[in-house]
Structures are given as structure tokens and as C-alpha cells.
Amino acid sequence: MTTSSYFLLVALGLLLYVCQSSFGSPHTSDSGTTLVRRRLCGSELVTYLGELCLGNRKRRGFPSMLKARAKRNEAFLLQRDGRGIVEDCCYNDCTDEKLKEYCHTLQG
């Protein structure tokens, strides 16, 4: 094995380790339910938030309304404890429970 292929193998191993630790296993809450932490940005964040706020109900036009708000930057100005949804769930990973805290702002 040459030095360059050994270096490549070590670099790949480190990359896999970093990815696994960044996106590792879901956390468990005190109640025993699994908390999936994820990072969502842009239209993916808007779409997921719309689906989460509606639950299983399908209301026509709601996701497109959210996308229109996102284009005007209103959806990203939502504040919770002095922080916005982008800081909470795009720059950092967050749970569905944290995302649900923004539902009342969008629907109200």
C-alpha cells in the first residue's frame, strides 16, 4: 500500500467518523421517546414546517403560502427566545418539538 493510498484511507475513515458523530444516533427524552435531531434549511425547512404544523391534515395552499413568506424572509424572522428558526434549525440541529414552537406564529 502506497503512502498516498494509506493517507486517503485514513482521511476517509476520519470523514466517516465526523459524519457519524455529527448525524449520530437519535437522542432519547426523559419520557423514553426518541428525539430525532435534524438540520433543515431553505425550502426544505419551510415544507417540513408546513407538514409538521398541519399534522396529518392536508390543507391546500398552506405549503405554498409558507414558501411565499420565505421568499419575503418573514418565515425566517420568526423569533423564539431571541433566536430565529434558521438559527435554531438550520445552523444547529433541532427536534420536531422545537419546530412545533413556531407553528402558532405561522398559523396565527
Curated annotation (Swiss-Prot):
Disulphide bonds in the chain: C41-C90, C53-C103, C89-C94
GO cellular component terms listed in the entry, alphabetical order: extracellular region
Annotated signal peptide: 1-24
Tissue spec. comment: Expressed by the venom gland.
An individual GO BP term: glucose metabolic process
UniProt-recorded Gene Ontology molecular function terms: hormone activity; toxin activity
SUPFAM superfamilies in UniProt: Insulin-like (SSF56994)
Listed SMART domains: IlGF
4-carboxyglutamate carried by residues: E44, E87
Keywords: Amidation, Carbohydrate metabolism, Cleavage on pair of basic residues, Disulfide bond, Gamma-carboxyglutamic acid, Glucose metabolism, Hormone, Secreted, Signal, Toxin
Function: This venom insulin, from a fish-hunting cone snail, facilitates prey capture by rapidly inducing hypoglycemic shock. It is one of the smallest known insulin found in nature and lacks the C-terminal segment of the B chain that, in human insulin, mediates engagement of the insulin receptor (INSR) and assembly of the hormone's hexameric storage form. Despite lacking this segment, it both binds and activates human insulin receptor (long isoform (HIR-B)) with a moderate potency (EC(50)=30.45 nM).
Primary localization: secreted
A Pfam family that the UniProt record links to this protein: Insulin
Subunit structure: Heterodimer of A and B chains; disulfide-linked.
Full protein name: Con-Ins K1
Record has Signal as a keyword: yes
Residue ranges annotated as propeptide in the record: 25-28, 57-83
Location of the protein in the cell: Secreted
Domain of life: Eukaryota
Family: Belongs to the insulin family.
Glutamine amide found at: Q107
